From Swiss-Prot:
Enzyme class, UniProt record, top EC level: transferase
SUPFAM superfamilies the record matches: PLP-dependent transferases (SSF53383)
Catalysed reaction equations from the record: succinyl-CoA + glycine + H(+) = 5-aminolevulinate + CO2 + CoA
Organism whose genome encodes this protein: Paracoccus denitrificans (strain Pd 1222)
Cofactor(s) required for function per UniProt: pyridoxal 5'-phosphate
Subunit annotation: Homodimer.
Keywords: Acyltransferase, Heme biosynthesis, Pyridoxal phosphate, Transferase
Annotated residues for binding of pyridoxal 5'-phosphate: S189, H217, T245, T277, T278
The name this protein goes by in its record: 5-aminolevulinate synthase
GO process annotations (BP): protoporphyrinogen IX biosynthetic process
Protein EC: 2.3.1.37
Positions annotated as active site in the UniProt record: K248
Length: 409
């Protein structure tokens, strides 16, 4: 076999379909977010505004977070020095897990190197804990959940997105004595729509199923203390296992689960993705704990309120220009383009001509024909930056002769 030719063919196919991913070289500057510096391919630097970042609230540069990280770095050095089982558990890791369990009203929490690993490791391990377990998964669950469920050596059922009636049919068709788990999300990041948490919890109660809720795009963002959509809706006590990230609203790095002490102890003891990997650096754990604690306060609520206001303003202004907004009421602002080449071209022109960075979202992240630009306004985007973005989108939409409409489903 000609291995080089096979690789060239695989990459060439992505180029032909307009979905080859390019990395934009940007450098965030302390105290200036959402502004950053883009280093062009020729080495020149251009000041830009980031409109697609996951640092939803700007906590990655908050003084409280940076101070905690500096203190831990000066006290302990760079790395943790080992796995959690072998010299890699510190007071900073324990403090972080205490903040997380408190955030979700659970007995315990467990920190992983990322939310992807937390999902993959936890979901793939559950068969060891519950022989005969059947997992019911929303068809639009994140790739990390899908991978974990694929590696789960047990029965799997996929229900149509947010379709509670279909989920009921699947649950009712299986052995009532079989252990069951329903895996779903509170906010689906590509469309920005909410999962029907209460309705799924009602079904879980009826069919004696565990609930597994991914709140990656909601923790820090919703609820009076940033505990996510389940906290906002008063449903945290009905969720058996939470998954979340430390790298979005909390602005740092890492992932976690929160659950009962028994559940966390079992995952800690059986999940290879937790056991056989170096733990988070103490400075990262310290920064994440400080961020979580801050976002539980009234000051944290002010950031959430401003972020929601900015998201509403951006949606209103883009919709007023006929942009096909996909608005499900969350903080995420997707604009439907529907063509990978156009989507990439819009992204490139926004960056090169207007200093606006938003990454195109193409297949396989979203289905073919639903390609989009996905904006994530933060509380630190100011009115001038919003105005500049709206005018740029208006100009390029006309230049590219794209259709305008009042809404998009």
């Amino acid at each position: 076999m000609d291995y080089s030719a096979a690789l060239d063919q695989a990459i060439g196919k992505l180029h032909e379909e307009g979905r080859y991913r390019t990395f934009i070289d940007i450098e965030r500057r302390k105290g200036a977010y959402p502004q950053a510096v883009w280093t062009r391919p020729d080495g020149t630097e251009t000041r830009i505004t980031v409109w697609c970042g996951n640092d939803y609230l700007g906590m990655g540069q908050h003084p409280v977070v940076l101070a905690a990280m500096h203190e831990a770095l000066d006290a302990t050095g760079a790395g943790s020095g080992g796995t959690r089982n072998i010299s890699g558990t510190t007071v900073y890791h324990k403090r972080l897990e205490a903040e997380l369990s408190d955030l979700h009203g659970k007995e315990a929490a467990l920190v992983f190197s990322s939310a992807y690993i937390a999902n993959d490791a936890t979901l793939s391990t559950l068969r060891k804990l519950f022989p005969g377990l059947i997992i019911y998964s929303d068809e639009l669950n994140h790739a990390s959940m899908i991978e974990g469920i694929k590696r789960f050596d047990g029965a799997k059922r996929i229900f149509r997105h947010n379709d509670v009636a279909h989920l009921r049919e699947l649950l009712a068709a299986d052995d009532p004595e079989a252990p069951k788990l329903i895996a779903f999300e509170s906010i689906y990041s590509m469309d920005g729509d909410f999962g029907p948490i209460k309705a799924i919890c009602d079904l879980a109660d009826e069919f004696n199923a565990l609930t597994y809720l991914d709140e990656v795009h909601a923790v820090g963002m919703y609820g009076p203390r940033g505990g996510g959509v389940a906290e906002r809706d008063g449903l945290s006590h009905r969720i058996d296992i939470f998954n979340g990230t430390l790298g979005k609203a909390f602005g740092v790095f890492g992932g976690y689960i929160a659950a009962s002490a028994r559940m966390v102890d079992a995952i800690r003891s059986y999940a290879p993705g937790f056991i056989f990997t170096t733990s988070l650096p103490p400075a990262v754990a310290a920064g994440a704990a400080a961020s979580i604690a801050f976002l539980k306060t009234a000051e944290g609520q002010l950031l959430r309120d401003q972020q929601q206001l900015n998201a509403r303003i951006l949606k209103m202004r883009l919709r007023g220009l006929g942009m096909p907004i996909m608005d499900h009421g969350s903080h995420i602002v997707p604009v439907h383009v529907g063509n990978p080449v156009h989507c990439k071209a819009l992204s490139d022109m926004l960056l090169a001509d207007f200093g606006i960075y938003v990454q195109p979202i193409n297949f396989p992240t979203v289905p073919r024909g639903t390609e989009r630009l996905r904006f994530t306004p933060s509380p630190v985007h100011d009115p001038k930056q919003i105005d500049h973005l709206v005018k740029a989108m208006d100009s390029l939409w006309s230049q590219c002769k794209l259709n305008r409409s009042t809404s998009a489903a």
